[in-house]
């Protein structure tokens, strides 16, 4: 699909969609609980549908209802944490890294004989050292490095050791699986943890289902790195009856950034300022640029002001880098975005694709090691860009187009369906002029 955008100011109010990150976690916990759970979720997307497919393949029954999902669990009961092996089917993860990295340890903890498949770059994205720990715990994984990936054997409880500089999804996946094991287990992380807020979301979701994760941090000393122990007891997830998925800061960030570079304020309603989502820090970043921020209990408003570049780290907010780079492109002076290494293994190599597509629109962006250096310009030009089948690159380009001097054409615009199928509808709601065409 091709999106043809005529530059037009974006302004007004838009509702937040459901947090994709939290929806994954709550639906997984619900499918593993001791009874039915109603999950209120105001939107869905391709990634969430992938998680639902995988849980269904493991025996859960998940009904789509008007306001979300009714989840009938995989297991009706768990006695002393002992589970019978499941004859799992094919688990189709689509292009969702979260689905694969969460469901692989869960399937192995259940003792499922399952076959994982996926699409796009997913098969090439790394699974080690998560896969190493699963194998060490007694499971057999055949086909690592691509698809199909076959699992057999049941994961033994124990201590799972991961470095802190790997995907937080590995840590979250092991945490989600831990209550299914026959005895208490520990996920031990050495060194500074990247994207820690996502682990906090996992702990929050597990707590909603009666599972406590005890966290012990041992500071670095005598030349040894810090160690964080996440200890989880064995036993069943316990349904609270109903849970609600909060609004999504990751996708709200696109509209808030549009407000920062536009001529009029933009408000996103339905986001919690007390959320554990790391991407709520988009407000702090935009404030550092100089944008005007208005916060309320359930909404945030951003309006442009004189923007100036600064130095920031992407350590805990890697998914914000593309759209923050668009803001930086229109800020005076230089912006340095550090700690971007993890962007290379997303749906695209986002260091490369962010640089390439913003440059195609007249920005001055260059890569220096694992950092981005961006020199501000007065406006984006028109031009043609490619999403590289990456939802965040497509949405970044659309936000940049609102401040372009000519028409912007986005190839592969259907990539937004991965996380935000209503993106272009909401773009029009805010006054954007976009037509969608078949390529």
Please place each PLM-identified region on the residue numbering:
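Short, structured segments at the rim of ligand-binding sites
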Residues: 1-439
């Amino acid at each position: 699909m091709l999106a043809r955008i005529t530059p037009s100011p974006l302004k007004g109010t838009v509702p937040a969609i459901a947090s994709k990150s939290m929806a994954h976690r709550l639906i997984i916990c619900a499918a593993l609980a001791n009874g039915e759970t109603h999950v209120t979720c105001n939107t869905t997307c391709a990634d969430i549908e992938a998680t639902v497919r995988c849980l269904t393949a493991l025996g859960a029954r998940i009904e789509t209802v008007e306001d979300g999902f009714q989840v009938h669990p995989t297991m009706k009961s768990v006695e002393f944490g002992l589970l019978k092996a499941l004859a799992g089917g094919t688990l189709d993860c689509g292009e969702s890294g979260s689905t694969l990295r969460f469901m692989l340890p869960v399937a192995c903890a259940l003792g499922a004989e399952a076959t994982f498949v996926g699409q796009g770059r997913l098969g090439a994205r790394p699974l080690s050292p998560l896969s190493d720990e699963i194998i060490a715990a007694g499971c057999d994984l055949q086909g690592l490095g691509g698809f199909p990936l076959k699992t057999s054997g049941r994961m033994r409880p124990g201590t799972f050791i991961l470095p802190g500089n790997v995907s937080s999804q590995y840590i979250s996946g092991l945490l989600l699986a831990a209550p299914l094991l026959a005895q208490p287990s520990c996920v031990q992380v050495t060194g500074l943890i990247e994207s820690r807020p996502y682990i906090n979301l996992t702990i929050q979701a597990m707590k909603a289902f009666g599972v406590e994760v005890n966290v012990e941090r041992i500071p670095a000393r005598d030349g040894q790195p810090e160690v964080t122990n996440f200890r989880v007891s064995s036993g069943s997830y316990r349904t609270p009856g109903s849970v609600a998925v909060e609004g999504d800061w990751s996708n709200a960030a696109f509209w808030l950034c549009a407000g920062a570079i536009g001529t009029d304020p933009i408000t996103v309603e339905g986001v919690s300022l007390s959320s554990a989502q790391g991407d709520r820090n988009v407000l702090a970043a935009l404030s550092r640029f100089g944008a005007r921020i208005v916060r309320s209990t359930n909404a945030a408003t951003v309006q442009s002001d004189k923007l100036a570049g600064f130095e920031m780290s992407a350590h805990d907010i890697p998914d914000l880098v593309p759209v923050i780079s668009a803001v930086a492109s229109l800020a005076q002076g230089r912006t340095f975005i550090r700690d971007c290494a993890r962007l290379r293994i997303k749906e695209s190599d986002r260091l490369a694709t962010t640089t390439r597509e913003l440059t195609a629109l007249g920005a001055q962006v260059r890569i220096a090691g694992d950092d981005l250096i961006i020199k501000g310009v007065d406006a984006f030009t028109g031009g043609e860009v490619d999403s590289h089948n990456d939802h965040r690159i497509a949405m970044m380009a659309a936000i940049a187009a609102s401040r372009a001097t000519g028409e912007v054409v986005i190839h592969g615009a259907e990539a937004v369906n991965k996380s935000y199928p209503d993106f272009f509808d909401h773009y029009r709601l805010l006054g954007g002029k976009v037509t969608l065409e078949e390529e």
